[in-house]
């Protein structure tokens, strides 16, 4: 079953362009390693607060990608996360889509 991984974080306004570039590099790297990533959407909540929502075809693929980030197997992750603060993530199973 499909799942969503959502991370809420803060970025200084002066770092926004660089954060987006680094995030795009991370999305490309993750998609290359884990093709079950089907969507990656970035939304701005306020001047500093962002929500990044990634849709996965399976929890197993999502978990493997999260583990790859934790172990340093995805080199683009470190630079992407370096510009963020107060990150909090959660995962949820999709139960209905229309």
How would you label these PLM feature ranges?
Residues 1-72, 81-98:
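Short S/T/G/P-rich N-terminal loop/turn motif that feeds into the first structured element of a domain
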